[in-house]
């Protein structure tokens, strides 16, 4: 029952999300001002990663069966007709692209703090900071390569997947969630850390940014300060969306995976909640960045045109 309902949901969700993501990319490319030159790149990468994440999750339609030992990863989407290793590659792509969206938002918040605090910071230091914050993504890639070697390297293992999936009609087994390996432990730490630690860290940095903005001299106008606050508030909201959407189901996942409880609702709904923030992110970006918001207000006819008033001055 869950599979039939969610197969329709995934298609509908993708149709809803894709146009907003493409529209967001268009607005960023077309209407970014000079002062958004750096942030434009991160906003674009974020939306592109979200498109990849949603597309792969909709093609996979995953279910992690927690009551089996080891925990099996089932695929109900169109990708199930491919080989197990191909499907697992899509699974890895969905995982990495999702993590990228979380870390890109946090990196943007941190670089905004650096920009507010030290205007003349050297470019090489920014590069070092970005690479350090992206290190968990590289670790995830290495860990997944290690797991793929374990799952698919022996020919007997691939034959086992082929034989197992040959007798299944509605889904395919594409891999396992195993414990006892360093790579599995690192993946768990990175995934849970990105969901539970990045949002509070982003909120803490936001407070420091607002403090820096408020303490700046009068050289920055009220409008400029408002634009900065609006931008950072939008980024903070983006970083908190995964926590709000995923926190309860992740807690449930942790319990059922340890107790080996069969809970179909949790198994099916987890991937849905993972991609749910992508529905709201484009709207947050377009509203929180002032040039984009002004352009959309212009398109909607909400910007009032002030008539020119000619005043005659009299010299005394």
From Swiss-Prot:
It is found in: Membrane. It comes from the Eukaryota. Keywords: Membrane, Transmembrane, Transmembrane helix. It holds the Pfam family 7TM_GPCR_Srd. The keyword Isomerase does not apply. InterPro entries: 7TM_GPCR_serpentine_rcpt_Srd, Nematode_rcpt-like_delta. The chain crosses the membrane at residues 8-28, 42-62, 89-109, 127-147, 185-205, 236-256, 269-289. It is a multi-pass membrane protein. GO terms for cellular component: membrane. Its main location: membrane. The keyword Repeat does not apply. Disulfide bonds: none annotated. Belongs to the nematode receptor-like protein srd family. This is Serpentine receptor class delta-48.
């Amino acid at each position: 029952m869950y599979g039939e309902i969610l197969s329709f949901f995934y298609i509908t969700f993708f149709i809803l999300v894709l146009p907003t993501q493409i529209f967001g990319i268009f607005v960023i490319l077309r209407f970014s001002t000079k002062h958004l030159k750096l942030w434009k790149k991160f906003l674009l990468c974020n939306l592109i990663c979200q498109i990849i994440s949603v597309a792969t999750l909709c093609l996979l339609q995953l279910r992690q069966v927690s009551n089996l030992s080891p925990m099996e990863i089932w695929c109900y989407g169109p990708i199930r007709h491919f080989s197990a290793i191909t499907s697992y590659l899509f699974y890895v792509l969905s995982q990495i692209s999702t993590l990228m969206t979380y870390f890109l938002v946090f990196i943007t918040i941190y670089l905004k703090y650096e920009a507010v605090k030290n205007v003349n910071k050297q470019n090489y230091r920014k590069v070092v900071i970005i690479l350090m914050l992206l290190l968990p993504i590289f670790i995830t890639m290495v860990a997944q390569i290690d797991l793929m070697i374990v799952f698919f390297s022996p020919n007997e293992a691939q034959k086992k997947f082929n034989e197992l999936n040959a007798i299944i009609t509605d889904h395919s087994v594409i891999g396992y969630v195993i414990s006892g390996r360093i790579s599995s432990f690192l993946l768990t730490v990175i995934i849970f850390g990105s969901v539970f630690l990045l949002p509070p860290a982003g909120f803490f940095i936001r407070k420091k940014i607002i403090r820096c903005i408020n303490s700046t001299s009068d050289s920055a106008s009220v409008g400029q300060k408002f634009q900065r606050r609006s931008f950072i508030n939008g980024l903070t909201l983006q970083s908190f969306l995964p926590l709000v959407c995923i926190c309860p189901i992740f807690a449930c996942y942790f319990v059922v995976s340890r107790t080996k409880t069969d809970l179909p609702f949790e198994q099916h709904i987890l991937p849905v909640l993972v991609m749910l923030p992508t529905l709201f992110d484009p709207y947050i970006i377009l509203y929180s960045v002032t040039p984009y918001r002004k352009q959309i207000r212009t398109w909607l006819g909400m910007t009032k045109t002030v008539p020119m008033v000619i005043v005659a001055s009299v010299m005394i």
